[in-house]
Amino acid sequence: MAVGKNKRISKGKKGGKKKATDPFAKKDWYDIKAPNVFQNKNVGKTLVSRTQGTKIASEGLKHRVFEVCLADLQGDEDQAYRKIRLRAEDVQGKNVLTNFYGMDFTTDKLRSLVRKWQTLIEAHVDVKTTDSYTLRMFCIGFTKKRANQQKRTCYAQSSQIRQIRRKMVEIMRNQASSCDLKELVAKFIPESIGREIEKATSSIFPLQNVFIRKVKILKAPKFDIGKLMEVHGDYSEDVGVKLERPIEETMVEGETEVVGA
């Protein structure tokens, strides 16, 4: 019989079993607040590890991007096909203040728009708002039959497509460059830009289902807490002003006697 260690006999581990720790014990919940351009400001909650040493919780939350359905923000199920991206800009107490960071369509909505016998026309343009945000806007539209048309198809000619695309770019640039980001987001919700494009291109070729399908923020200005508070509607000139206590209250407090003293 060979003398040596029997490898089958398991050796006891040092320290024994480790206690199962709850991963949420060292984390805190924060409320996500949307800009006041949307009807519902309470988006939801997010988790972050508590402040430990040099790791500050609020710094870990900044620049987080949240994707929210516009139907939840507006309380309207008809807007469920739009996805709004919000980026955390600042943390105040347990509230995470966000700002608009982009918009997109759901895949099923885009696929439902594409059909036979019509021409798809797309355009995109880089624009700069009055508050120095640089955005890239993508537009999509489809041709439709003219009034009293018997022909099944409604294809546009190449020259007409170029004219329509030129109009799309022109309207998107004019609409975005004449307002700030907050006002521009307010235009995206009711699709007022899409309706204007439909009206402007009706003389070239009638269009239907014209949407600003995607918006990307390419460049943002330097962070300004004052502008962020204006976007959230919580900004006022009386922030940090010391309030004097009414004289009547102080007099009443002085006259009160303790019973049984």
UniProtKB/Swiss-Prot annotation:
Source organism superkingdom: Eukaryota
Similarity section: Belongs to the eukaryotic ribosomal protein eS1 family.
Positions of region (Disordered): 1-21
Subcellular location: Cytoplasm
Quaternary structure and interacting proteins, as annotated: Component of the small ribosomal subunit. Mature ribosomes consist of a small (40S) and a large (60S) subunit. The 40S subunit contains about 33 different proteins and 1 molecule of RNA (18S). The 60S subunit contains about 49 different proteins and 3 molecules of RNA (25S, 5.8S and 5S).
Basic residues bias (residue ranges): 1-18
UniProt-recorded name of the protein: Small ribosomal subunit protein eS1
Chief subcellular location: cytoplasm
GO function term, MF aspect, one: structural constituent of ribosome
Recorded GO CC terms: cytosolic small ribosomal subunit
GO biological process entries: translation
Keywords for this protein: Cytoplasm, Ribonucleoprotein, Ribosomal protein
